[in-house]
Amino acid sequence: MNIDLNADVGEGCASDSELLTLVSSANIACGFHAGDAQTMLTCVREALKNGVAFGAHPSFPDRDNFGRTAMVLPPETVYAQTLYQIGALGAIVQAQGGVMRHVKPHGMLYNQAAKDPHLAQAIAKAVHDYDPSLILVGLAGSELIRAGERHRLVTRQEVFADRGYQADGSLVPRMQPGALIHDEEQALAQTLDMVQAGRVKSVTGVWTTVTAQTVCIHGDGEYALAFARRLRAAFNARNIHVIA
């Protein structure tokens, strides 16, 4: 059994270099919520050095709140902003002789696109128009995955090790109780349930089915590196291969 393990990088965390030795995929911030040209270049070089697949991590234009502010923007604006961010990273990747593999929206752009078909359509169209060979990463079972499929993109359904789930398979909003899982044992058990059994227990106690093709671990967590190592060990013990 194979699973992709991904993390967001280029967001100002000192642990990026070490994290890139533990994951199989990296989502590189493109400047709208965090990062800049220099951090993008550094992350691309580190990913190439470690043989890690990497992609663009576009966001709403929201550096003040790390891309976590809800916004209502015309789909055409989201399309243009997504293209702009993918293109910025793409230029750096090309100059370094690499190949960008995927696009994964960030923060509130990701969460809103999971439920809003018009927003999801704008993102999927931008990815397709930039490079139809790119993989579109989105919340498992979401509108973003469906939009990617409509554009005949390869999609990757994502689950989260350290986030709480609602009964409909969506993530618990960050401002609500149960949004973040701080207990390492609980996060590990949830991840293994999603990967091996295709199910997740919601904060209300209801089990719901989920397709886990890639697991996100957040690199800005206090114990991110230790948890990443433990998760890798748990996968190895169960003959689950971490591969992009």
From Swiss-Prot:
UniProt keyword ATP-binding present: yes
Keywords annotated in UniProt: ATP-binding, Hydrolase, Nucleotide-binding
SUPFAM superfamilies in alphabetical order: Glycoside hydrolase/deacetylase
GO BP terms: carbohydrate metabolic process
InterPro entries assigned: Glyco_hydro/deAcase_b/a-brl, LamB/YcsF/PxpA-like
Any one GO molecular-function label of the UniProt entry: 5-oxoprolinase (ATP-hydrolyzing) activity
One Pfam family, short name: LamB_YcsF
Domain of life, per lineage: Bacteria
Enzyme Commission number: 3.5.2.9
Catalytic activity: 5-oxo-L-proline + ATP + 2 H2O = L-glutamate + ADP + phosphate + H(+)
Annotated TM spans: none
Similarity comment: Belongs to the LamB/PxpA family.
HAMAP family: PxpA
Function: Catalyzes the cleavage of 5-oxoproline to form L-glutamate coupled to the hydrolysis of ATP to ADP and inorganic phosphate.
Protein name (Swiss-Prot/TrEMBL): 5-oxoprolinase subunit A
Gene (UniProt): pxpA
